């Protein structure tokens, strides 16, 4: 069995820990590197020290050292960090699984350009359940296109820095696409004061931040006499880690190209 040699960015964070544990427990994967910011107190420590069973892989801030033995980099960090990693990986043929959210238009364009040099999986949510939910939303939108108001409500922990979540935005894009629209043309990102009657063609967003909520998303289709709610709730980040490994397996035979979890799951 060929071993996937995988490095993890943000190795000392909560998601980094979950990814490292999943890689160490996978029969077809090897932890080959670990990265974190230069100011992290974890630099120079064993990447699996939190598990009480050292891996022999030290957390590095230098990309050349941290990625020296890697064929893949899984990155759930922040846009500015991911874009630095992206440049290095594209130049060295290292495949990337990007779960970072909050990219602007230029950042997304940089990812697309890098995909001409290496294979990239870019998805706002690696959970299999979330991505099946996306397909359900596409089907629902096609059937609730007239007479139903669409609202997307998402909740995350107090430390999440971007809003709405990347997953909520992707849900909006899927719904808008199913209706033959562009999300930016119909999205209402917030409401305050005297807003007037609701535009029936709009897609509304509401954001909640608090506690340790990992990620809850509900899409409401509200019609006359009935409401349909399609929800996904994350109880552990382990689903993101398992989805990331599934994404790496999908990329294993790809040289270049930009993919998302819909490709992995055959939901196109």
Swiss-Prot record:
Q: Which GO terms describe its cellular component?
A: cytosol
Q: Which keywords annotate this record? A: Amino-acid biosynthesis, Cytoplasm, Diaminopimelate biosynthesis, Lysine biosynthesis, NAD, NADP, Oxidoreductase
Q: What is its EC number?
A: 1.17.1.8
Instruction: Note the Gene3D superfamilies from the entry.
Output: Dihydrodipicolinate Reductase, domain 2, NAD(P)-binding Rossmann-like Domain
Which compartments does it reside in? Cytoplasm
Pfam family example for this protein?
DapB_C
Q: Which domain of life is it from?
A: Bacteria
Name the PROSITE patterns on file.
Answer: DAPB
Q: Name one GO biological process term.
A: diaminopimelate biosynthetic process
Q: Where does NAD(+) bind?
A: 10-15, 36, 99-101, 123-126
| Alphabetical list of InterPro entries matching this protein | DapB_C, DapB_N, DapB_N_CS, DHDPR_bac, NAD(P)-bd_dom_sf
Instruction: State the family it belongs to.
Output: Belongs to the DapB family.
Q: What does this protein do?
A: Catalyzes the conversion of 4-hydroxy-tetrahydrodipicolinate (HTPA) to tetrahydrodipicolinate.
PANTHER family named among the record's database cross-references = 4-HYDROXY-TETRAHYDRODIPICOLINATE REDUCTASE 1, CHLOROPLASTIC-RELATED, DIHYDRODIPICOLINATE REDUCTASE
Name the chain's protein: 4-hydroxy-tetrahydrodipicolinate reductase
Q: Which organism is it from?
A: Herminiimonas arsenicoxydans
Question: What does the record give as the organism's lineage?
Answer: Bacteria, Pseudomonadati, Pseudomonadota, Betaproteobacteria, Burkholderiales
